[in-house]
Structures are given as C-alpha cells and as structure tokens.
Amino acid sequence: EEAREVLESLRKNGVKKVIMLTGDSENAARAVAEKIGVDEYRSQVLPDDKNRIIKELQDAGSTVMMVGDGINDSPALAAADVSVAMRDGSDIAREVADITLPGDLYQLVTVKNMGNALIKKINKNHMAIIGCNSLFMLGGITNVIGLNTAAFLHNASTMAISVDSMKQLDIKEKS
C-alpha cells in the first residue's frame, strides 16, 4: 500500500518511469510489480546487471534515481544520477548513496519535491542574473549609465540574487 501511494505521488511530481530491478524470481517479481504498480520490472537481476541497466538508461538520456538498501545494490547506487538508501539498509549502501532516508518511503516524495523546488529556484535566479547583468552591461556600453554605476549595479544584483538563493525553498506537494 505504502509503495503504491509513493509511486503515484512521485508520478504526479514528474517521475516518468519506475523500473523495479530485483534478484527475486520471475513469479515473486511479477507479484510485487503488479501490487505496487511499477511501469516495468526485471527479475533475477545480478548486482552487475543492475549497474549495467542504470548505465543503459543514462546512455538513452534518462536521469536515473536508484533506491536500494542492500550490498548488492551498491554498484547501481554508485552509478545512478541520484541514489537513495534506507536507514535500515546495509552500511555500504548508505555510504554510497547520495541520500539516506531515516524513515518510510513517503520521504522519497519529499526529496523529489525538494529537488523540483531547488531546480525551479536555480533556473529563476539564473535567468534573473543574466537579465539584470545584460541590462547593466548594455547600459554601460551605450553610456545610458556610467561604467562605474553599471559595475556597481552588476555586483549589487549578484548579491541580491545570492541572498534570494539562500531563502528557504517553497516546497509544494502535488496530491
């Protein structure tokens, strides 16, 4: 139940495809995949196979997040663009992972929302700094404003946008 709800929330927040990679048998993998609602599953997958599959997905242009908890997941966790381990997982999985979740799977949704908010803020600030600095450069070049004023405004806008970057993220969950 928890896994199905988490996957539905992740899809609402931009996750396009969920693939389950497991060392379990075909029957066990199919049963779990159907129960939780993954898009695709692969059974009887060895650790090196998980790593290879991650790299194939990346080579095809996908950004890959790997969630794992065991020693066998460690190579794939290391290869993924974003890797998440559970607190109760193996020491090596937690060490290799970018993020260790201290609790339940619902925290994956929070992490995804934080990532979405961070990317949105980075893009907004990037466009703001390019816009402001372009205007100030143009103003200085055309003598609409003095060069010293343009340089001052450039630095002031950079500082103001840097301060904005430090503000708390506005995280909105889609339900």
Give the location of each predicted region:
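Short, acidic/turn-prone active-site loops that include or flank metal/cofactor-
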Residues: Q44-N51, D88-D91, L105-Y106
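Cytosolic catalytic headpiece
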Residues: E1-N72, A76-V82, I99, N113-N116, ...
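Conserved phosphate-coupling serine/threonine residues in phosphotransfer and NTP-handling enzymes
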Residues: L21-D24, D88, S157
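Acidic (Asp/Glu-rich) catalytic motifs at the cytosolic membrane interface
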Residues: V67, A93, N155-A156
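Membrane-embedded transport module
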Residues: S9, I99-S175
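Anionic-ligand binding region
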Residues: S90, A97-D98
